[in-house]
Structures are given as structure tokens and as C-alpha cells.
């Protein structure tokens, strides 16, 4: 499916063919420490330091790796009150990616599309390698032996949280595609 169709609708006229998708995702740029040289006066530099704490948008030429691409498939209801539990497949397919500065490229098909005889909507999620994020785990749970959250440790960003707590945790950033609507004719 051409990238121009992302976020739009298409119809499959040839009932003998299933849709084939190609996806490419690249990671975000890794951040360099500090701020770039802006050619600021001493007063401007001090103000920038006070406001930003010495950290600015300062991307390097190196990208984070995409670790996997997940595909979500949604089949619209055919009638009112049709149960949706089996119509939303999150996650439908998962593709592991090799570390590469060039990103990750996958190709897949919905082999059951024609057989099922129903319209479908597809999204993809590109998942980056873990990186540190402020409030990347906003509840910061303590878990019991069964994996249930038994206590939250919220980072409030106020006097309610110790000022030495920077609230930084590891998180897998993700990017979503626009939907692709594929209709039966």
C-alpha cells in the first residue's frame, strides 16, 4: 500500500488478493548533554541556565534503535451491539527489529482479509529502545509477587515530592501511524 494512503481509505477490488503493507520507522535522535552554542551574552547564558538547568533541545546525529513494530487490527462492527472484544486485536502482529541507524523496515499481509470478508483498520506502533524519561513511569508502583500494584509513588512535581527525586525512569517511547482503512467491495 503506498504511503500516500496512510490515514485514508482504500478498497480491495480483486477478491483473490489480500492487502500487503510495508512499514519503515526510524528512531528519534539521541540527545547530547547541555545546550548548543547560541552565541549568547553572559546574562542570556545565565538566564538560559536558570530556566533550562543546562539542558536544551540538542540532538546528535545518532538515532535510537527501533526494537519492534507492532500492528493493531480493528474490524468494525457489522451490527449494533456486536461484541467488540474479538474485533480489536491489540497487538495483532509483532515484528522484532535488528539494531540499525537506518531504522526498521517490515512487510506483512493480512492473509485472512478476503476469507473474513470484512472491512479492517490497521495501525502500526514503532517502539524505541528504552531511554530515560522524566515521569516515564508516572505511578512508580511497588508490585507484589503476582505483579499487582500495591503502592504508588507518584512524582507530583511539587513540594509533595522530595526535590532530590528527579522522577527519571526508563521508558520505551512509541510512535503511532495514521490508520489505514481497507474496505471490501
Language-model features, listed with the residues they occupy:
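Single conserved hydrophobic/aromatic residue that forms the stacking wall/gate
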Residues: 1-7, 12
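Short acidic/polar inter-strand loop motif in beta-rich domains
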Residues: 127-140
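Structural beta-strand segments of beta-rich domains
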Residues: 17-21
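Short, aromatic- and glycine-rich surface loops/edge beta-strands on solvent-exposed regions
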Residues: 118-130
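Short amphipathic, basic-aromatic surface patches that mediate peripheral association
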Residues: 24-62
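Exposed aromatic-hydrophobic patches
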Residues: 101-114
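Divalent metal-coordination and catalytic microenvironments
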Residues: 71, 124, 177
Amino acid at each position: 500500500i503506498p504511503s500516500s494512503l496512510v490515514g485514508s481509505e482504500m478498497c480491495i477490488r480483486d477478491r483473490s488478493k489480500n492487502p500487503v503493507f510495508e512499514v519503515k520507522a526510524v528512531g528519534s535522535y539521541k540527545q547530547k548533554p547541555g545546550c548548543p552554542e547560541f552565541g549568547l551574552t553572559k546574562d542570556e547564558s545565565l538566564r538560559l541556565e536558570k530556566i533550562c538547568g543546562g539542558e536544551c533541545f540538542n540532538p546528535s546525529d545518532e538515532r535510537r534503535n527501533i526494537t519492534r513494530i507492532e500492528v493493531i487490527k480493528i474490524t468494525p462492527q457489522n451490527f449494533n451491539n456486536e461484541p467488540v472484544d474479538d474485533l480489536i486485536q491489540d497487538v495483532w502482529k509483532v515484528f522484532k527489529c535488528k539494531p540499525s541507524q537506518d531504522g526498521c523496515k517490515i512487510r506483512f499481509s493480512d492473509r485472512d482479509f478476503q476469507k473474513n470478508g470484512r472491512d479492517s483498520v490497521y495501525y502500526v506502533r514503532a517502539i524505541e529502545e528504552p531511554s530515560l524519561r522524566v515521569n516515564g513511569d508516572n505511578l512508580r508502583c511497588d508490585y507484589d509477587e503476582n505483579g499487582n500494584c500495591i503502592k504508588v509513588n507518584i512524582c507530583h512535581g511539587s513540594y509533595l515530592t522530595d526535590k532530590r527525586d528527579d522522577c527519571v525512569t526508563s521508558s520505551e517511547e512509541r510512535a503511532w501511524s495514521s490508520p489505514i482503512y481497507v474496505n471490501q467491495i
